[in-house]
Amino acid sequence: MFKISFLVLGLMLLMTRNTQAGEKSLYDFLWLDPDKKVYVLQNKLFKKEHTFYADVGYMVNFTSKFQETSGFTGRAGFYVHEEWGVELMINSYNNSNNDEFRNVRIINAQEPFIRRLNSSYAAMAIWSPFYGKINTFNRIFYFDWSFGLGPAKIDAESNLKSVTQGDVVTTFKKESYTGAILKTNVKFHLTENIHLGAEYMNTYYRAPGPRNPKSDRLRTNTDVILSVGFSF
């Protein structure tokens, strides 16, 4: 999952490299005379430098095989530069057993190993190098594409001890980890102050598992988030 996440980010950067055109970028028009040069003006309608923003969002988790997990996220940030900002984030998760969990419990007469996140907190650096617009028949939609990375505090719980001891009915113990969050976000501007967001977020941390309860391994938690926010 760790390699796949960076592969996805790499492909996204490659596909969108043209959206980083500056206001004085040179464009090649083959139908012009060779000695002609054309510059396309890319004026930014929605400036980010020295602006605050706050978002709330709904997230869906794609990590656990045995849990239905969703939740809510809130974040606030400030752009110190047109391309660079800082952000504080809080995520809250709701977990429930799914059909896979119930099937395993019925067939094997034992519950599977589960680790589920309850909440996470992060302080992130935001890099927003890409911007662009989508032309429709009667409206132009402007967007920014950003990336975020920062340390995170993760509150979770698992039934690791019960599973390794072979208990029929498991109990969950609270756990706490320090890790990191890596994400990418596309923000669509509806007005000067209101925007919608779509985000892909990975949470990384090290934790033990049932195969080797005394050894930590890198774990990944993946969320997709839809959000709404305002800036000023």
Model-derived features with residue positions:
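Repeated loop/turn-to-beta-strand initiation elements of outer-membrane beta-barrel proteins
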Residues: F52, E83-L88, G132-K133, F188-L196
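Gram-negative (and chloroplast) outer-membrane scaffold detector with strong preference
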Residues: E87-K161
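Transmembrane beta-barrel strands of outer-membrane/channel proteins
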Residues: V56-V60, F72, F78, L88-S92, ...
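Extracellular loop and loop/strand-boundary signature of outer-membrane beta-barrel proteins
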Residues: L41-Q42, V60-N61, I107-F113, Q165-F172, ...
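Residues that define the transmembrane beta-barrel architecture of outer-membrane proteins
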Residues: H50-F52, E68-F72, L117-Y121, F143, ...
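Outer-membrane beta-barrel translocator domains and adjoining extracellular loop/strand segments
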Residues: E68-G71, D99-V104, N138-R139, S158-D167, ...
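Short glycine/proline- and aromatic-enriched beta-strand/turn motifs that initiate or cap beta-hairpins
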Residues: A21-G77
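Outer-membrane beta-barrel "beta-signal"
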Residues: E23, Y121-W127, R219-F232
